[in-house]
Amino acid sequence: MDWRVLIVLAPVIIAGSWALFNIGAAAIRQVQEFLNRDKLA
């Protein structure tokens, strides 16, 4: 694989993984809030 391809793809992969990480963290937070609300009711 050409090094130029890596230079082009690296920022895209980093941004994609960062977005997935943030979405996953937000989803876990929402699930935890939902479970906590379920216990309080």
UniProtKB/Swiss-Prot annotation:
The entry lists its GO molecular-function terms as: manganese ion binding
Xref: InterPro entries: PSII_PsbY
Q: Name one GO biological process term.
A: photosynthesis
Give any Gene Ontology cellular component. Answer: plasma membrane-derived thylakoid membrane
**Pfam family for this entry, one:** PsbY
The yes or no answer to whether the keyword tRNA processing is present is no
Q: Which superkingdom does the taxonomy of this entry point to? A: Bacteria
Membrane-topology descriptor: Single-pass membrane protein
| Keywords of the record | Membrane, Photosynthesis, Photosystem II, Thylakoid, Transmembrane, Transmembrane helix
What subcellular compartments does it reside in?
Cellular thylakoid membrane
Q: Does the keyword Repeat apply?
A: no
What residue intervals traverse the membrane? Answer: 5-23
Tell me the protein family, please: Belongs to the PsbY family.
* Job of this protein: Loosely associated component of the core of photosystem II (PSII), it is not always seen in crystals. PSII is a light-driven water plastoquinone oxidoreductase, using light energy to abstract electrons from H(2)O, generating a proton gradient subsequently used for ATP formation.
Please describe the quaternary structure of this protein.
Answer: PSII is composed of 1 copy each of membrane proteins PsbA, PsbB, PsbC, PsbD, PsbE, PsbF, PsbH, PsbI, PsbJ, PsbK, PsbL, PsbM, PsbT, PsbX, PsbY, PsbZ, Psb30/Ycf12, peripheral proteins PsbO, CyanoQ (PsbQ), PsbU, PsbV and a large number of cofactors. It forms dimeric complexes.
Q: What name is this protein filed under?
A: Photosystem II reaction center protein Y
Q: Which organism is it from?
A: Gloeothece citriformis (strain PCC 7424)
Lineage of source species: Bacteria, Bacillati, Cyanobacteriota, Cyanophyceae, Oscillatoriophycideae
